[in-house]
From Swiss-Prot:
This is Transcriptional regulator protein Pur-beta-B. The lineage of its organism: Eukaryota, Metazoa, Chordata, Craniata, Vertebrata. InterPro entries: PUR-bd_fam (IPR006628). Transcriptional regulator which can act as an activator or a repressor. Its main location: nucleus. It comes from Xenopus laevis. The gene is purb-b.
């Protein structure tokens, strides 16, 4: 995808020559690092990793059968949260049984409208807030099947004339609909791009308008958050990332191996308990290891211990050592 296509949601329709020149300048400064195409049912999805002076970010575009396009823009930090949320939706979708005809009819045409435009029953919903951006995730169904609807809205602020409707400073939202059968493929492709191009230096969003993801200064309504970090043990790497959503502040701990990735999310109110549990187990394991070393030492014969345990053993050496100390 060309930068001109994937960057069009960043206020390209701003009025006046100066707005156009600023838009073109931003486009020229943006580099595309990687692109992945997914064909799911009759739709095409593009995942593009881009970079500008503010950092790296991911653009997601849906191209329908008629060529219509919808785009979302995610910081690397928000993309990581999306990846984990997708895992939750995948698990929920796998537990759902088949829909009955009555449920499908109710989901698609409660008001008699029928067809794809009618109301749709939400099976699971989540949302994220990142300063001037909001992301809504809804697992829904209609007569064509189940799908994940992802909607992004951007508040440009009172001083921005976006020219896209919705009131002063408010840009109309962008929405993509991902067929449920493609959730795993989409999640895996996103995870691969994050693994290959994400990093500690990409916590900020390269999106302009003061938006930022997790990490210091990116806590949205919660203000500044601690920086993420990582540790490497053998072939594993553990990432610690602090974020926030509608439920509050949380710590996401991700375990990453070359062919495996898993994560847990710990709410802020449980950090102290988790820390206390880790410290307690660390101390207990130290005591267990010391007892095991003592038992192994006791099993050894006098010769294996160095021959200097008994009261008379090595006495000459002890006297010599004492004399040296006295001489000093």
């Amino acid at each position: 995808m060309a930068d001109g296509d994937s960057g069009s949601e960043r206020g390209g329709s701003s009025g006046g020559p100066s707005g156009f020149s600023q838009h073109m300048s931003r486009e020229q400064e943006t580099q595309e690092l990687a692109s992945k195409r997914l064909d799911i049912q009759n739709k095409r999805f593009y995942l593009d990793v881009k970079q500008n002076a503010k950092g790296r970010f991911i653009k997601i575009a849906e191209v329908g059968a008629g060529g219509s396009k919808s785009r979302l823009t995610l910081s690397m930090a928000v993309a990581a949260e999306f990846r984990d949320y997708l895992g939750d939706f995948i698990e929920h979708y796998a537990q759902l049984g088949p829909s009955s005809p009555e449920q499908i009819a109710q989901a698609s045409g409660e008001d008699g409208a029928g067809g794809p435009g009618g109301p749709r029953r939400a099976l699971k919903s989540e949302f994220l807030v990142r300063e001037n951006r909001k992301y809504y995730l809804d697992l829904k169904e209609n007569q064509r099947g189940r799908f994940l609807r992802i909607r992004q809205t951007i508040n440009r602020g009172p001083g921005f004339s976006g020219g896209t409707g919705g009131g002063p400073g408010l840009q109309s939202g962008q929405t993509i609909a991902l067929p449920a059968q493609g959730l795993i493929e989409f999640r895996d492709a996103l995870a691969k791009l994050i693994d290959d191009y994400g990093g500690e230096d990409d916590e900020g969003m390269g999106l302009g308008s003061g938006a930022s993801g997790g990490g210091a200064g990116g806590g949205g309504m919660y203000g500044e958050l601690p920086e993420g970090t990582s540790i490497t043990v053998d072939s594993k790497r553990f990432f610690f990332d602090v974020g926030s959503n509608k439920y509050g502040v949380f710590l996401r701990v991700s375990e990453v191996k070359p062919s495996y990735r898993n994560s847990i999310t710990v709410p802020l109110k449980a950090w102290g308990k988790f820390g206390g549990a880790f410290c307690r187990y660390s101390e207990e394991m130290k005591e267990i290891q010391e007892r095991q070393r003592d038992k192994m030492y006791d099993r050894r014969g006098p010769g294996e211990r160095g021959g200097s345990l008994g009261p008379g053993a090595g006495g000459g050496g002890d006297d010599s050592e004492t004399e040296d100390v006295d001489d000093d």
